[in-house]
Each structure stands twice: as C-alpha cells, then as structure tokens.
Amino acid sequence: MMPLFFSTICIRKPIVVGARFKYCKALAVALLLLLAFSAGALAQTAQWVKQMGTGGISNGVSSDAAGNVYATGTISNPGLFDSITIPCNASDVFLTKYDGSGNILWANVGGGPLLDQGNDVATDSAGNSYVVGAIQTNGPNPTAKFGNFTLTGHGDYDWLIVKYDTFGNVVWAKNYGSALGDIAQGVTLDPSGNIYVTGFFSSAMTVEGVTVTSKGLFDVFLAKFDPNGALLWLKTAGGTGSDIAHGIVADSAGNIGMVGEFQNTATFDAHSVKAAGLGDAFIAKYDGAGNNLWVQKGGSTTSFAVDPGKAIGADAANNFYITGDYTGTATFDGLSVVNTGTSGTDIFVAKYNTAGAIQWLHHAGGPASDKGYSIGVDQTGNSWVSGFAGSGPGVVFDSISLPPLGNEYIYLAKYDPAGVVQYVKQYAAGTGQDIHVLNNGCLYLNGGASKGSGNEFDNISLVYVDRGGFICQFCETVSPACEPPTGITASSITSSTAKISWTAVPGAMGYSTQYRKLGTTRWKTKESSAALVKLTRLSPATSYECQVATLCSTETSPYSPIQVFTTTP
C-alpha cells in the first residue's frame, strides 16, 4: 500500500507511483528550440550537456575542489551513462562523476527491487559525496543494496544517506524510518565537513538510537552527522498538519537554512508560525548546535492549495535566497505578490538577511501553472532560478515577457543581488531540478527532459528514447546586443484588421508581435520574417495594444514599448 502522502502532497523531487514517476506537473512531450531573453549583457551559455537514461531524472548536483561534477537521481533499466551501461531495477539511485569538460569518469547505481530515489548530493573538497533520498521497502524483499551494504527497511519508505569516495566506492550507507513513509529531501555540508540532512517523517522514527514522533501526518527532521556517519544530533519541527522540508543550505559561518511547507501551526523549537491558508512556505535558520534561531513564513489565504518553498541558497554574506510557488496573493513578512493567472501557480523568489528580515520579493508567471524548483547563488548574491513554466500565453519575469511555446518548458532566470532580473532563457520541455553555482562564472543545471528528439540547450541537441535525466554546464559569455525594433506604427486599420510595421533591425532573423485588447491580460502572438505583420479577426471599435520583439540568431530581444491603436466601427 502506498503511503497517503503520495496522493496528497507534491514534493520537490519526483515521487515514485506505481511503475512510473509522478511529477508535480506532467512534462510536455514536444521539445522546442531555445529562446533567450536579455539585454545583450552577460548570459549563461550551455558548454556541454549530458543525458542520463532511461526513464529517470537527475535531482541533485554538486562539485569538488578539482572541478569535477557529481549528479544523483533516479534511473530504470538499463542505466545508460555515456559509454557506461549498468543493469538496474525498476527504479534505482544513481551517482555519476564527470570532469569539468563533461567526460564521464564513473557511475554507480544502488537500490532494491522496488522504487527508490536519489534526491540530493553534497560533495566535500576531497571528492567524497553524500547522497540522500529514499528506498521503498514494503514488498516481499524489503532490502536495498549499495556497494557491499545491504539495507533493510522499516516500512513503506525509509530515508537514505550514502557516502561515496572520490572513486565511486560506497564507504557507508544508512537508512532510517518508521512504519509509514519517510523521505530525505536535501543534504549540505558545513565548513568542517559535517553533514546535515533534512526531509520529512511520520509516526515514530529512530535514528541511531534516538526516537522522535511526529505531531501530525508529517513532521520536518534535521539531522547532523560527522563525516564517519555518527549522529551528532536530531531535531524535528512541525504541528498537526503535513510539514515537509524541501531544501537545505549551510552558510559560511556553519549555520543552516531550511525551506519547505507547513500547515496549521508549526513549531520550530521556541518559535511558531501559523499558515494563512491551507499551507504556507517556511524558511528556518539553525546554528551548528541545532538551535533554531528564527523562522519566517509566506503564503496566501487560499484554502485549496499549499504554497511551498522548494529550494534555498546562500551568498558569502550569509543571506538566504529561496524560491517556490504560490496561488492567489501571497504575503512574505509584509511584502506581497499577486498571482498573474486565473488558475494555477506562480513562481516566487525572495531574499532574507542573516536576522531573517526579508530584503526583496519577486514573482513570475503566466495564466498556467509555473513552478520554482531550484535556486543557486554566487558569492556576491547573484541568483539563478529554474523549474518549469506552463504552456499557453507568455510568462512574465518582471520586465521580461516570454512568448508562449505551447508546452511546459525548462527556464533559467538570473537575478542580481538587488533582485532585478537580468535575463531568462527557455529550454527543452521538462523541469530544472537543481542548480549548483561555481565561482568562475559557470553553473550546473540538472533535471528531467521529455521523450523526443531535438532537445535543445543553446546549440546542443539531445535525443531521448524515453524520459531521462540531464546535466548541463553553463558559463557566462558576452553576447551582442539584440535590440527591440523601433518606429512601431499601426496603419490600414479597419473594423477587423490592422497592419503593424516597424524599422527593420540589422541582422534580425524575424520578429514576434504580441497584441491584446486594451485592459485585458492575455497576449496573442504572431511571428513574421519581415518588419510587418497583419492582424486579423479584431473586434470593431476596440482599442488594442501591441509590442514587437526581435528574433536574433541566438537570442530574442525584450519587447518594444507598447503601442495603442483603435479599430474602426
């Protein structure tokens, strides 16, 4: 019997249901060409992309001091990693190591006969990696094998932590759980190499002789281990509802930031937060001894949806940055954002200082559901956010409007330290699960892409015979400015048609024109190769607004200033 939470809650990583993954939103089938939106400044460009198949997803990514990169996730048989093929069960945990040029060095797969998942990875400077996730152990053979270690489960799902050395050998593996479902969602390392794991548990759970009991359906756990796997302390937080941690990060001072979701009233040591609606996002800070320093919350008053915090990052000044999604009007410490669609969710991005005071709050979205799943932050406070954007009319990131692609797609958005969006890129149909930022202007994005051919990451194309994981290295490059057209003019206006023309942009590959009735929110889009487009099927005696973007060879400009025209009666 599957635990109840698999049908009621959407967690950051995919949960395995039956013989397939259940995503928070189904991935689109078709994959489309990259469109990049920026002001012609520094933009991340794909250097290499690797795919991991078949039937899986890559959930976590990290790197070591030598510039090697590690990715974990879930995969089914056969486990294909470039030239390496590893036999798998229905759903196993994998860890791969690549050098900085994308050459695979090794791959390791572990698990049992049922549906196991790798959710996150952290790597120390020596190249030791710590993978967390879950193993399903409610079948006739409730075991999972990682290297020479055989783990026996306690219930439906146990949470998992495995240490690998730099050569891919399993150093130790541990699992913990209750009679119900327990999942490890995130892992991070402090400057001393101690390991922090977070996730959620139910009922009574014992970790290295320490037993804790949830107050509600699920509670948050935070565990600290030394590098040898010895438990140093175990903390819990929550209340009478479903309380789940999705992400974790350690700052340079050894403090821990966590993000997730809660219902009703949740208690973190001496601090409590109360949800405004069905469920809110939380961000909590702990010191290295496990003391809760503060907790903040944000969300809407809607009674039909939870507003989860999905990922967290930190800069060199120890500020925290979070992302997630929300419905309705969501308030975070006095700042509010309004959902742009009539249904579904929008993305939020927020920055908090070391004392827990919010510094800024931004949102992005369109009429369909849009999700923020991952965030990466550099030392100076630039942040990159990814997840997926919904199909339908275009998604708006502050001043940047994206044209509709007709399918859900991966996006990558950059914000400067003040929260000003710098650019947004659109990629293949799928979801961006994790971001790891380096200090050399590069970052890694991993996730899952849909079955099909022509999966484009900038000019790199992949072909998937089944849904599969990917990892992509991006580095900042200076691109030539792609400017919007000027001289937008409406002419030959009738009761149902109008011609929109503009001054041609040198080197343009084409143009994208958006138009809508004045006072409405939904844009319609027409593309053209010439500096002219004819709009048809307009309503008589109606005012319209229009804007035009330039399609360049490698990116798309912002839209021009809006022009207004009125059809004849």
Describe each region flagged by the PLM:
Residues 1-23:
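N-terminal secretory signal peptides that target proteins for export/translocation
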Residues 28-38:
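Bacterial N-terminal signal peptides
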Residues 40-480:
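A sequence-level/structural motif corresponding to short, flexible coil/turn segments enriched
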Residues 480-507, 540, 555-569:
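Pro/Thr/Ser/Gly-rich low-complexity, intrinsically disordered linker/stalk tracts
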Residues 507-525:
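Extracellular low-complexity, O-glycosylation-prone stalks/linkers
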Residues 529-534:
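Short S/T/G- and acidic-enriched coil/turn segments that sit immediately N-terminal to beta-strands
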Residues 535-554:
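Beta-strand-rich modules
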